[in-house]
Amino acid sequence: MTTINQLYSRLISAMGVEDLEIPMTAVKFYKKEDEIPGPVKENQPTISLTSCQAAKQASLGDAALLTTDNIGCVAAAITFGLVDKDQTEPLGDSRVYTDIMRDQSGLGDDFKPPSPKDFTEGNVYACKDSGNMDFALFGKEDVGRFKDVETAKKAMKDMMAIQPPTTKGVFLYSRDFDDIDIIPDVIVLSVTSAELTRIIQAYQFNTGERVTASMGGLRVVNSDLIVRPYLTGKINVAPYCLGARLIAEFEADRMGIGMPFSIFEEL
């Protein structure tokens, strides 16, 4: 049994609820200078996946190595440090998130996907104010996720990201992945409010420390639940965002809690 499976089993046993299962995703970052193990490379998707899709699929037993070649969300590519936030070239022709834009734009082959810089400058999230309705997700009536470009840029300043980019790949995998015993950097649990209460109680029992949640309405899986715990070394709690609900189909009664592996070990 792998290390994370042992720790997960201990957590579930401590909950004392018969047949309880809490969806869990383990996350491992590989930097540009790292050698990615063969069994991990074997789980590199040949189609694009958003980070929230990869996280959801991992919680169901799958695994996915996300790289610049297959990540389906430009925002997540920025957050994970796979690309520079000011890159002016689009990631590629077909990505899950930008394909939605292409479909609603009606432009077909004439559609040009937004670049990382378009996201950084607020042109995507404030598509109406920036005059870029091609970047809308919900047709002509879509005003974007923020009222104007300045508000979008302000919000993005608080969305933690690994910048400048230093990441070669991000591996999201299930507790059942046992080709090799990988120690993850971050653990994400998809919890009900009652399960969240028990986990916070367990953390406080050992540390006496309160948990402060920092959350936004976008980039919740990649930024709030994965990169924020990775960079701060602290737990974070956040509800799943629009993309996670619509694209990855996270359940309405669940939210996420992300934590460094070192904290998960002590629960």
Residue ranges with predicted function:
Residues 4-267:
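Acidic, serine/proline-rich low-complexity intrinsically disordered regions
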